[in-house]
UniProtKB/Swiss-Prot annotation:
Extent of the transit peptide: 1-15
Primary site of residence: mitochondrion
Location in the cell: Mitochondrion
Record key words, sorted: Mitochondrion, Ribonucleoprotein, Ribosomal protein, Transit peptide
Pfam families attached to this UniProt entry: Ribosomal_S2
Name of the molecule in the record: Small ribosomal subunit protein uS2m
Species assigned in the record: Schizosaccharomyces pombe (strain 972 / ATCC 24843)
Physiological role: Component of the mitochondrial ribosome (mitoribosome), a dedicated translation machinery responsible for the synthesis of mitochondrial genome-encoded proteins, including at least some of the essential transmembrane subunits of the mitochondrial respiratory chain. The mitoribosomes are attached to the mitochondrial inner membrane and translation products are cotranslationally integrated into the membrane.
Assembly information from the UniProt record: Component of the mitochondrial small ribosomal subunit (mt-SSU). Mature yeast 74S mitochondrial ribosomes consist of a small (37S) and a large (54S) subunit. The 37S small subunit contains a 15S ribosomal RNA (15S mt-rRNA) and at least 32 different proteins. The 54S large subunit contains a 21S rRNA (21S mt-rRNA) and at least 45 different proteins.
Homology family: Belongs to the universal ribosomal protein uS2 family.
């Protein structure tokens, strides 16, 4: 009997029956997918494969009616009115983005992760912590790069330091600002102003480009499905894991080469 002919109660009963039968022979039916696994423990770059991208839905594009012609090299074909993204192209561009992140992290660069769609907050925050960078999950403030001093003045803020007794006190120094060395944007269509400001200030960007987006918006496009949280979580996790590995290598090299001064 096919599963679609069973009622929800029958499906639950069948699963419980299979579980009880498997316990008798020492087997356990483990879940195949955990929604938060790619956020808590993302796959390292060595495990990047076509089946991994396929399972995340990275190949699913948008309707052919809203197709952007500049994404033609990324498209494999059409099926039921939507474009199918070539995962071979996704693999090539994703590996290039991984190399870019690796080079930035190797030089202790600042990486900014941006994801402002619903559901992207957890992956953006986790990726920023893993890469020792920063994150934006609410909205991009216009002028954050091109008019940083004015935006900083409107936002306010002050520099705190500790006195001799360890108490925090406010200083007269004005907070300074530093541009990021790389911006990873999970949804470039909703953050066009961020892409334009990055171009004007010569900040390189990595962005997930769906079939309805313009790959020229970012410096290093990654053709993939930007509507799938599983896909965006996977890409953000891969890129942040690369940066984490580079920082771990630097710490290991420091521990190996450090020395003690003679008394």
């Amino acid at each position: 009997m096919l599963s679609r002919k069973l009622s929800p109660e029958q499906l639950v009963a069948r699963r419980l029956k299979i579980r009880d039968w498997n316990h008798k022979i020492g087997a356990v039916v483990a879940p195949h997918y955990s929604p938060t696994l790619s956020i808590r423990n993302p796959a390292p770059p060595s495990q990047l494969s076509l089946p991994l991208l396929l399972s995340s839905g990275a190949h699913l594009g948008h309707s052919t009616s809203i197709w952007n012609p500049y994404t033609q090299p990324f498209i494999y074909g059409k099926r039921e009115g939507i474009h199918i993204i070539s995962l071979d192209q996704t693999m090539v561009y994703l590996r290039r983005a991984i190399s870019v992140v690796r080079s930035i992290a190797k030089e202790n660069g600042i990486i900014l992760f941006i994801g402002t769609r619903n559901g992207q907050k957890d992956s953006v925050v986790a990726a920023a912590k893993r890469a020792r960078g920063y994150h934006i999950f609410d909205r991009w403030l216009p002028g954050l790069l091109t008019n940083a001093r004015e935006v900083q003045g409107k936002l306010g803020g002050s520099i705190l330091c500790k006195d001799n007794r360890g108490k925090l006190i406010q200083t007269d120094k004005k907070p300074s600002y530093v541009f990021p060395d790389l911006m990873v944007i999970l949804n470039p269509l909703e953050n066009k102003s961020a892409c334009l400001e990055a171009q004007k200030t010569h900040v390189p960007t990595i962005g997930i480009i769906d079939t309805d987006a313009d790959p020229r918006m970012v410096t290093y496009p990654i053709p993939a499905n930007d509507d799938s949280l599983r896909c965006t979580d996977l890409i953000a996790g891969l890129l942040s894991r690369v940066a984490e590995q580079e920082y771990q290598k630097a710490n290991q090299a420091f521990e190996k080469d450090k020395f003690t001064l003679p008394l």
